[in-house]
Amino acid sequence: MHASVITHLRCPVCAGPLTAAGRALRCAAGHSFDIARQGYVDLTAGRSVHTGDSAEMVTAREALLEAGHFDVVSDAVAAAAAGVPGAGLIVEVGAGTGRYLARALGPDRVGLAVDVSKAALRRAARADPRIGAVRADVWQGLPVRDAAADVILDIFAPRSGPEFARVLRPGGVAVVVTPAPGHLAELVAALGMVGVDPAKPERLAASLRPWLTQVDEVPLRATLALDRAAAAALVGMGPSAWHTDPAAVTATLAGMPEPITATLEVRLSTWRSGG
């Protein structure tokens, strides 16, 4: 793990600073956390957490993102991060494969990929040499020192207003991407995917506004032209994977002419820490 990332980490047990000690991270109180051979560190400290995305979901997401279908999102996220002054740390919560984080680093920053999925962290740890990957649950507290981050990325991921405010430095910014009600509407109708809660914008504001100040919100929209494999990956990479039958999805897609079109429709909002 990159030394400059470790300097921003804190012990999940006692909140003391972590330092490298061979193939482990340790604090002064003696708490020790092994670095897995795949490059990530489990900092859940034995607490029970959700297992997160399965290996199949991560593979599907990696294929879809690498094909460039969500580049309109990654480009906008990278631009928003680049607009925040500083040459320090970017933290991505729910980082998945680390692709968004790697594209947002720019020339001068290091990144921390946080996820609960071990399958995702194996990918994130390899996404860029400047990225460190840790297993942690945002609801149980991020293993990051106070005021350590220039930017937090949260892309289709859980959020914690109090933790974001604690981890961001004064003037730091959280970049949040959430689906709009029309996101992938064509596939939702055809394949039984999970739809978007119309009240999602209100819930987002309620989760962040007491702790951060909203700076901006911009809509992002693109028409995706997918082959059947990409459409299946789109279903299989997110929450719909838990609610659909892969065989039924494959059968439905077999009867749909290519390219299969779907509308990517999301909102990107930025939230500043007042410090």
Question: Positions of the model-derived regions?
Answer:
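Class I SAM-dependent methyltransferase Rossmann-like catalytic core
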Residues: 46, 50-76
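Conserved SAM-binding loop of SAM-dependent methyltransferases across substrates and taxa
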Residues: 97-108
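N-terminal auxiliary segments of SAM/dcSAM-dependent transferases
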Residues: 1-51
